[in-house]
Amino acid sequence: MSADIVKQLKGTRSDVKAAATTIELKFKEFSKGIGINDASFPLRYELSVLRQLCLALKDNLHQHADLYCGIAATMLPHVEPYEEKPSLWEAHLTSLRYIHHGLCQEKSLTECQKMYGLIRSQPCRLQEEADYKFYLDIHLTHFNGIYLQMQKETLPLAATDELYYALEAMGVLFDTMHQRKVAKNAALLVQLNDSLFSKRSKAFLKYLSALPPESTTKMYDPLLKLLSCSWATPSSELTNQFTEYLGLVLALVQIDMFSIEAPLEQQLALKLLRICRDLYKDVSPQNYSIQLLYYYVKLMYVREATADFKQTYIDLCKKFVYFFEHKGATHAKEQWFMDLLVFFQRLQTLLHQSSNKPPLDIFWQQLEGDDSSEVYTAHFQLLHGCLGLAVNVVRSPLGTSCSNEACKSIRRHCLLYFGMCALEAYINWQPTTEQKADKAPYKPLLGILGYTLDVAKSMKCLGPSAMELVKLVRLLALVAEKVSCPEQMSLVLAFLEPLQHLRPLIASQDMLSVLRRIYKASVHCKSSDMANRLQSTYLAALTNPSRLRSQLFAHYHNANNTEKCVYEWHESSPMPNPLTPAQTKQLYDVDLLAVLHFLSAPPVPLLQSLLRCRHNDYHLALLARKMRTDSEVVRQCEELRSQLHSTALKQPLSRMQQLAIGHTSISVLLEALEAQKTKFSIKETAENCLEELIVKNNLLELNIKREHRLVELATSAIAGFAAFFERADTEPLGCDDTPIDWEALIDDAVAAAMALSTMGYMAQADEAWLLILRIGQMLDERFTYLRALTHFLGQDHLNSNQQLQLSEEVDRAQELLDDLWPQLQNGWFFKRQHTIVMLCLCHMASYYARQDCLCHAQLLLLQAEELRAQFDERVGKSDIVQITIQTVRFRLEYLRNKRCSSLPRRPTPLRQLDTLVDSVRNYCTVSSVDLGALQLLLADLVRESTECAANRLTERFAFYGTMLNLVLQSGMALRTIEVLISWLWMNLQMEYLDQAQSKLRLLDHLLAIKPLSRTLVEQTSATYVPAIAAKEDLKANAMSELTSNMLLMQLVEPIRKQNQMDVATIKSLPMHEPIPTSHQLQRYVSKQGTPPHLRDSMQLQCIYFIVGCLHARFSFLKRENDQLDDFYVGAGNWLQEDPVRTATLGSMLLVHELYHLNYLRFRKKHKEALSYAEAGLKSVYQTADINYSFNFMVQLKTARLELHPVGKARAKTIRRALAFNTSPEDKRRKGVVEGSIKAKSSARKTPRFKIYTELELRPPIGCSNSSSSSSKSGNENTPPSDHVDLNACQAIEISDDDAASVSASTPAPSQLKRSQSVPAKATKTRSARVGSQLKVPEIIELDDTMEETPSTSTAATVKRYPTTDARSSRARNRQLEETPATTRGRPRRKVPEPAPQQETVSLRPRQRN
């Protein structure tokens, strides 16, 4: 070839065209025989041109590729092999291959297809055996190039024909090789495996299997035909080709499986295994293994169910195991054996990956059934045998290559895949219940599993994104999910520890999936401890607090073993989570709150477990709330509290420390309250045995000093909560801070407030409830807010120091109530919440009543009643709501100064008190807040009922015993003092001086002034002999009994209940002991005399002052007046010292003023009494009992009469009136006489009393003319008197209960006529008629008006009242044993002729002051 052509081929396009024209002309000449020196000249010329084309393609970068293809097309038909020089043809094929490879690129695909078509159009000429390599290389390159471009979608779908052409061309090549008997199959297999079969990816083989069988068959059949002809291949070469055959079989198996149109129909792998069986028939080790593989693949390819399939497979697995056991020791290090193991591993991988989908699903279906346990046992044994021999695998071309450069071990990958195959087989197995209990399949499986995980730990290529590890974790999760019996659970327990070593390599989500399935499978653990450990592992792995909380709730709901908390179980778990410190703390915090909130009564071991694992002091405070019966926990709380208080002296406490102080203080407080409780019957709280009760029940330690510690604990808790609350929003919570349990804070704050309220310390209780109100408002805790507000609504006077606008809070509460009360019936609320809403309505009614909104108050009470009637559990029962409604109505009635015409008339206050007594007696608890509310309500009722009854001169002792029983059993000193003060007030009103003396001793004991034990010692050492009671003669005793019985039969009140305006000296009855010097009255009003433990509390100062007022009244009634002047002067100074303290006395200040007025009148200081009475009348506040105003007015008018008497008339002996309740006035009342005569005539058959007008007794020695005789006025040697006047009548009290019935038949006060006392003559006429029958008592209703008249007072009318009404008169309810001790067993006091009396006014007997 000339140099011009060479230059032209590398030149421009026109130059290339010129060269192409020259070459074309040249080959035309060759075809005509011109210029041919020999037969090889055209071939040599063509080679020279092809060489230049190769160089030109390289230099011009395919710029003229189309022209080059045209030049090649011109030359190829004119060349053929030259037999004498085979190298020329080899060079020709090499040049064509180079040009085709150069054109097989994306930018020259058209020229490539043109060039390949040109090569394919020429006959396949194999001059030498090695020439097939060039053709095969061209076909494979073209096939792979077109496939690659089609994957990139750079060619149209029609380009698929090029693939068909390539496959057909390879089939032609294989036929040519078979015809030429080319026996070099080793190189052919290597080239085919590298480019088309075993070394290609799974995706490529899937694509290849998807090609039409018409094209692929034209390649597969010639290839298998070529491979079947060994042409006497030596055994050594066959041994070397063993790996390539296995690789080709593996690829054909995949092609058979992936075939779309007819999977497993071609059975290419089986055909190749038959060929290999024949090829290796003389190579014994390989021959047997190929036979086993042939039958194994044949079973895989089965398309129909056969009867003996299971047994066949079991026998085949046993033969494999036998072969591996006997040949493994000999050939384990040989390459073919290692290749065989790797091939079998890949075959098993293909088999198990298609277990649940065609075409191998039939194979797995036939393994199920009755004998599936034996089949799977054989299968697991086969895999276990392969796994044991695979440890000898060093290298194999069949092994999968790892993408990680650090991993070069095929052995580890082989072992890992064997283990995953076993896990997949186990997951696909569906055993029956009986088969699950068979342990035979689990034994080889456990070995496989353990070895696989051990190998996985040592692999360097495994990571969170490694496909092998992801698949292994997924399989382990499915194994755990499959667990349904303890035998299956043994597999899970086997991989726990190895899996823990792999945990750093596993993605968090994948690991969480495994742990979740282990969590569910743990229910089948034989050991409950292990089950709890496994469950705690999954729970600890949850980092979302909400999800963790819900899962913990479910765990503790279904847990069979609650000896430890989840946090502690996790610490001993075989798979502990690698938690950060923040996650560890979060786990404990959520675990703690779940136990405290979800379990109403957590088991003690569970709480102790949480206590052992606590992280800070706040955890101890929360746990102590549930372990208040544990003395050790309470001791720890006390130590923590002391430690924090010590720290507070050195540095400010953090808010969490303040919160811990609050909770620990409550724990210590409640334990102390519980420890001081005792039990005794309510019958033991009788009035005459209170001191014995204190001694008998070991209550000598009960006093105000001991209770001071409890108050300190409660106030310390509230102070801690308040300090925390003030800083709650100012400082954000850090990651190390424990979430605040606001529910626990509210509960403990309410417990402190309830303790203070129940103990009676109202100032401290107000602060506690105000804090709770603010917390409830901030947290939108509606029921907490309403409960706190209810405390303030029930108070008559709010503390001025409190920053509380009650009117604004009431408006806010009304909005809440309007939203809440319609929803209470929906069942979304607890019973205690129902109670809170209804109690708030009741106390809000009380609030509006104090604001003079009576109609609004009544409407609120009606709403509460209607709301209560909607709950079936309250209907027909006396619950706290009903008692509260009755109490509020009682307050509305007896504290109302004027009646509203628009409101219905209610029963009288005393009758309402009787109703309240019945309701309390029949009390029924409905919710958890009822008992506390009842105790607070009873404390108010004791005070209010005492005030109401005392101002009406009647006795209402029903609440005293109940309340005293409650407070004494609870060990509450201040509440006991309040009850005893009320009782003492009533005793003094009724002049029960013995009982009053006992109350004073008890009060001194409770106030820690003089212990009762010392009093009892002094009382025991003293010798008290009642003179009169021990020396009274029989006649005097009979007379005393007779007069007492007469009074009882006549239903007459004792003389001390009469409102006598003459204040002559009344000598008291003898007391059991004199008042010692330590009981000086001055100590009650002097700052120095007040005990130190009472000086710091305004409430206790007021209590002490009230006791002093009552003590002064007691001294006055005993006529021990030496200290009273100094006391009342000191009391006035005490009251002026602190107006706020004075205001807290309430109605007891009015009582004190009335007592003071009475004393001033007794001392004839009428002017001073008048000024005090006028001031007192003005000081009565609007909401006070109306009787206070009446009492001040009575004292005022009486003092005026005593200051300016109208005239003095000679007072006659008071005679016993035949009509009862007559006033002992100077002038006789004619109306009474006429009324009594008329009544006698209208009831002729009525038995009458026998009145003794005279008694032949000698006058006593030393008898004085005082208005009342002392019990020491006589002795046993007193001679009988010649005359005893028993005509003095004792007035019968008219109770409020009788007012309505009496007023019906009684004329108006203006129509009443004056009457005179019954003359003695009329009395004497009746003295002879004392028969066995008694006259029906006649009740006289007194006028309420007050007149000043010189000689007469308001008349009284006589009215008969039936004796069958048991509730109409309090006198009828009084039993014999209720008669005051001062009137029993004691001679009747003699009434000598009095001096002329001053003119007095007739008043109601209940206005006694």
Swiss-Prot record:
UniProt subcellular location: Cytoplasm
Separase cleavage-site, as annotated region: 1052-1058
Region (Disordered) residue spans: 1260-1284, 1297-1409
The species this protein belongs to is Drosophila pseudoobscura pseudoobscura
Q: Where is the composition biased (Low complexity)?
A: 1264-1273, 1300-1310
Q: What does this protein do?
A: Required specifically for chromosome disjunction during all mitoses; maternally provided protein is sufficient until mitosis 14 then zygotic protein is required. Involved in formation and/or maintenance of epithelial structures: bud extension during Malpighian tubule development, and foregut and hindgut morphogenesis.
Mind listing the GO biological process terms from this record?
Answer: cell division; Malpighian tubule morphogenesis; mitotic sister chromatid segregation
> What protein does this entry describe?
Protein three rows
Q: Where the protein is mainly located, per its record? A: cytoplasm
Could you give one GO CC term from the UniProt record? cytoplasm
The alphabetized UniProt keywords are:
Cell cycle, Cell division, Cytoplasm, Developmental protein, Mitosis
Quaternary structure, per UniProt, is: Interacts with pim and Sse. Cleavage of thr contributes to inactivation of Sse.
